[in-house]
Swiss-Prot record:
It comes from the Bacteria. GO terms for biological process: defense response to virus. Residues 25-252 form the Reverse transcriptase domain. It catalyses: DNA(n) + a 2'-deoxyribonucleoside 5'-triphosphate = DNA(n+1) + diphosphate. Mg(2+) binds at D107, D200, D201. One of its GO terms (molecular function) is metal ion binding. It is an enzyme of class 2 (transferase). Pfam families: RVT_1. Belongs to the bacterial reverse transcriptase family. This is Retron Eco8 reverse transcriptase. Transmembrane segments: none annotated. InterPro entries: DNA/RNA_pol_sf, GrpII_Intron_Splice-Mob/Def, Reverse_transcriptase_msDNA, RT_dom. SUPFAM superfamilies: DNA/RNA polymerases. The gene is ret.
Length: 374
């Protein structure tokens, strides 16, 4: 097998590939690459979570794009990581566990917020040449870190953080967590347990008939390993089951156990909305009512520019919303069928159901496109 060549970023690589025009003046005048300022970042609240969006006009934003493309994506990761990786997906996170007799899902509490910036520096330093970028004032690694970290005004006690919402944060989280993935994977291998991770979600399965994954011992061991890097388990999201487990709308079931092959399917709740939408369309319920009631889409009055054309605008809006919703769900279901064709792990009865839903969706899309009346 061909070994992937280790990447090493040096001053020339930074200037010609990563920075380009972004900090050209700093390079010429030999002034340090600055940290990301508060005026370059917008804070977005979503429930109890805070996301950070860097302005597209920020030079750091352009550096982040190139860091992802030319640097971070070339750093090797642990095989357990299934999110934020090329070819990764939620289904690939679930698929290794179809042989399980018992299951355990653990959630890492405040995943991004608890990534230590010291661990970020330690994890990236082997791939960045130990040299100065600006005279003897700023090391190359510090210049790069200034483009991926942020001193949040609402988390001053943390210093520099890897903000949830920065385009480089997902890749960096996998790189930093690689050490932890390896420790957990090694522990699980000794116990005959399968492990995979999707961002902050960790899934474990045991092919053998055993109560290990439901024991305090197992949870304590994983907790102990996570604590090495300052991570904790979110106890409220702990799930352990035998024969079948439902996670985020997906169900893994293996009634046979003892290493037999199980299957994956979508839960009834995951399909509930699209089935209600297609049923409502079959009953010729107005598009506006369907959008308002089932997909929770409602046209705001302020978005209607011309009162005289309100009815026409509203009809087109809800028609387009339905087409977009059905088209998106159609693509999603097709991805399940394609995944099954490669991995043979989706429940066969469910594949039949999917094909029926796909046929209904396609017929409704065609009808909506032809129909110009509500």
């Amino acid at each position: 097998m061909k070994t992937k060549k280790m990447i090493l970023v040096d001053k020339v690589f930074y200037e010609k590939i990563l920075s380009v025009e972004s900090f050209k003046e700093n390079i010429i005048t030999q002034s340090a690459i600055p940290k990301i300022s508060n005026k370059e970042v917008r804070l977005i609240s979503s429930g109890s979570k805070i996301f950070y969006a860097i302005n597209n006009t920020s030079p750091h934003s352009h550096v982040q794009l190139r860091l992802n493309r030319f640097f971070l994506s070339h750093i090797p990761l642990n095989s357990a990581a299934k999110a934020f990786v090329r070819g990764g997906s939620y289904l690939k996170y679930l698929e290794p566990h179809i042989y399980g007799s018992s299951y355990c899902r653990l959630d890492i509490s405040s995943f991004f917020n608890n990534i230590s910036f010291d661990d970020v520096k330690q994890s990236l330093s082997p791939y960045i040449k130990d040299e100065y970028l600006i005279g003897t004032e700023q090391k190359l690694i510090d210049a790069i870190l200034n483009s991926v970290g942020y001193e949040s005004p609402i988390r001053k006690d943390k210093g520099m953080i890897i903000p949830m919402g920065f385009r480089t944060s997902p890749a960096i989280s996998n790189i930093v967590f690689r050490k932890m993935d390896l420790l957990i994977q090694d522990f699980c291998a000794k116990k005959g347990v399968i492990y995979s991770r999707y961002a902050d979600d960790m899934l474990f399965s045991n092919p053998r008939e055993s109560k290990l994954l439901m024991s305090d011992y197992f949870i304590d061991e994983i907790s102990s390993l996570l604590s090495i890097m300052g991570f904790n388990i979110n106890q409220s999201k702990y799930i352990s089951r035998e024969k079948e487990i439902s996670i985020n709308g997906y169900v893994i079931e293996n009634k046979g156990g003892n290493g037999s092959i199980g299957t994956i399917r979508l839960s009834k709740s995951k399909l509930n909305t699209v089935l209600k939408v297609t049923h409502a369309l079959a009953q010729n319920i107005p598009y506006k009512n369907i959008c308002n009631k089932y997909i929770k889409v409602r046209l705001k009055e302020k978005n209607i520019k011309y009162e005289s054309k309100k009815d026409e605008f509203e009809k087109k809006y809800y028609r387009d919303q339905l087409i977009n919703y059905l088209g998106g769900y159609r693509s999603y279901l097709i991805s399940l069928v394609k995944f099954h064709s490669e991995y043979k792990c989706v429940n066969s009865d469910f594949i039949i159901q999917i094909n029926g839903i796909l046929n209904d969706i396609q017929n409704h899309i065609q009808k909506i496109k032809k129909n110009r009346r509500l």
